[in-house]
């Protein structure tokens, strides 16, 4: 199970709103204690695609985030991105691009501006989705 603080959620939400009308993205790093994963830091990255339907994280920012995780004793827990105009569930492209069955994929839907929805998913090797 993944645990995220309210302040980290608000940081992600602000980043995703600032990215509108495009998708926004980032990484999450933290610690694992048994079955529990605790997000300790949210890394706000640039969507190189500047698109409202897909994203590509800036590779330099990704590398800097991973270096920071290592420096702080964190492990990569997964990534997040927004869906400006669709629900909080993996699209076919999201499933196709899911590279790690152990990574958490967080999707923040901004489809209803007054009611953002954040969900976490796992995507296995067969591209089957499990909601966390």
Predicted segments with their positions:
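Conserved beta-strand-loop surface patch within small alpha/beta domains used
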Residues: 1-76, 85-132
